[in-house]
Amino acid sequence: MKNIRNFSIIAHIDHGKSTLSDRIIQICGGLSDREMEAQVLDSMDLERERGITIKAQSVTLDYKASDGETYQLNFIDTPGHVDFSYEVSRSLAACEGALLVVDAGQGVEAQTLANCYTAMEMDLEVVPVLNKIDLPAADPERVAEEIEDIVGIDATEAVRCSAKTGVGVQDVLERLVRDIPPPEGDPEGPLQALIIDSWFDNYLGVVSLIRIKNGTLRKGDKVKVMSTGQTYNADRLGIFTPKQVDRTELKCGEVGWLVCAIKDIHGAPVGDTLTLARNPAEKALPGFKKVKPQVYAGLFPVSSDDYEAFRDALGKLSLNDASLFYEPESSSALGFGFRCGFLGLLHMEIIQERLEREYDLDLITTAPTVVYEVETTSREVIYVDSPSKLPAVNNIYELREPIAECHMLLPQAYLGNVITLCVEKRGVQTNMVYHGNQVALTYEIPMAEVVLDFFDRLKSTSRGYASLDYNFKRFQASDMVRVDVLINGERVDALALITHRDNSQNRGRELVEKMKDLIPRQQFDIAIQAAIGTHIIARSTVKQLRKNVLAKCYGGDISRKKKLLQKQKEGKKRMKQIGNVELPQEAFLAILHVGKDNK
């Protein structure tokens, strides 16, 4: 056991985690040169296209160190986006140390800090690594100082490397073996294995990624899931070298995968503990704290025949993604679907794309909303995650919206722009600290504003230099109203949105104008109105198409023309009474863009 090293690679987006993993795999000979490709661990097509890591991946390698010993390295490549930070915290729970990768050109950014603090809270050994030293803009001295100033760990000895060219990666491995402690645990004790991640394989059923904390797991053992008490046979187990390799046993301190022919998706939840049926452990390992979704949206299949397939797909996906929450929902405009909870907008986009790609579904998404806390006049507190569930105005005593605490790191030059943006988003400044050339800003901003487009606007006002990390702080009373959309006098539930009273006029007007452009003209007038309660705040009309009934009249009597026009008018009136308005998919997406700048 003293030769096992478990570690994660953590860093801000694009600081070179995945490339460094590639080099480590290459040096340790996990894959032959022929099988090697860039970002070997980003196995999902989506990850490759967007150039981001979404799922944490684990690899087991053997490294022959300069002291002549052979070490077993179990390492996990983690995502950098704030939406996937729960993946990072789960990966860290399986490790004794972390490589903190910092771009020697960019310096410390918000995610670097957030991930590093997560690692420190879990008492992990953090090893700083300065990456990209081959860049002309690299300034390792300055960045090392920044790490000490802002993060507070000693970086004078930080390893310098370039994952792209491979310079210094050997030193990273040597430092790892030296600084990261070996796992603790009792190989002879009762088995305790933590489920770090799981996914669904069409042939094998549920595959779980586990870290053995105590004891040993052998092939053919009967294992018991601590939370449900279910027992299963350990059919196959092994490690990733990134390829799946079968082994006969997993020893104490190792990280590997396990297949137990579990068909039920919720059979082995992530964060649970496995133990042996014949010699069970006394208590379960401390799991992970459940992540609360921050953003909710309705997802509906375009054709209602896909509903069953959609439900199965969500089940399989939620196994792989512990933070995805879903419950059935029906809408009068869109039929049956699900209300899903996500960690942020990027997460929502990714899930939607994965459903459309991997499971071949066509989906309509309604506007994302955050969770509001509502105290009704009868003093009961309810949580509302969709505008249609909001009680009537006269039944609400107080409506509270979620406030996010946002930590931003940016160069001083952009401070003015960023503060203006935060104020516009109804933010309140709580802290501001100068570190050399960088400023650390802390603002409390309503979650609804952060979720809408705050990140994009922050990047554009600071030319991409500012970075953001946010988390939920509390609920706070606020003057929020629901804006309904009426089409020919009928409410369309899927188009409602909750917004602050100050913005409601503008949002309503903007939404109505957008809808006017998107709804195709029909044989009768379509009135589009935005209303708060019974009070109409905006209106526009999609004009009818009409045939020129007078084309056949040459000269002739005025009464003849009047008769024809009158007849057409009555026809249109009848049509309007029975006519239905078909809303195109774009109309539902229009709400996503309300309140965003059209620059």
Curated annotation (Swiss-Prot):
SUPFAM superfamilies hit by this protein: EF-G C-terminal domain-like, P-loop containing nucleoside triphosphate hydrolases
Broad class of enzyme this protein falls into: hydrolase
Domain tr-type G as annotated: residue spans: 2-184
InterPro entries: EF-4 (IPR006297), EFG_III/V (IPR035647), EFG_V-like (IPR000640), EFTu-like_2 (IPR004161), G_TR_CS (IPR031157), LepA_C_sf (IPR038363), LepA_CTD (IPR013842), LepA_IV (IPR035654)
Superkingdom of this protein's organism: Bacteria
Protein name: Elongation factor 4
Gene Ontology CC: one annotated term: plasma membrane
Pfam families the UniProt entry points to: EFG_C, GTP_EFTU, GTP_EFTU_D2, LepA_C
KW Disulfide bond (keyword) present: no
A Gene Ontology BP annotation from the UniProt entry: positive regulation of translation
Reaction catalysis annotation: GTP + H2O = GDP + phosphate + H(+)
Coiled-coil ranges (or none): none
Localization (cell): Cell inner membrane
Enzyme Commission identifier(s): 3.6.5.n1
GO molecular function: GTP binding; GTPase activity; guanosine tetraphosphate binding; ribosome binding; translation elongation factor activity
Membership in a protein family: Belongs to the TRAFAC class translation factor GTPase superfamily. Classic translation factor GTPase family. LepA subfamily.
Keyword field: Cell inner membrane, Cell membrane, GTP-binding, Hydrolase, Membrane, Nucleotide-binding, Protein biosynthesis
Gene3D superfamilies per the UniProt record, alphabetical: 3.30.70.240, Elongation factor 4, C-terminal domain, Elongation Factor G (Translational Gtpase), domain 3, P-loop containing nucleotide triphosphate hydrolases, Translation factors
Annotated HAMAP family: LepA (MF_00071)
Amino acids binding GTP: 14-19, 131-134
Bilayer topology annotation: Peripheral membrane protein
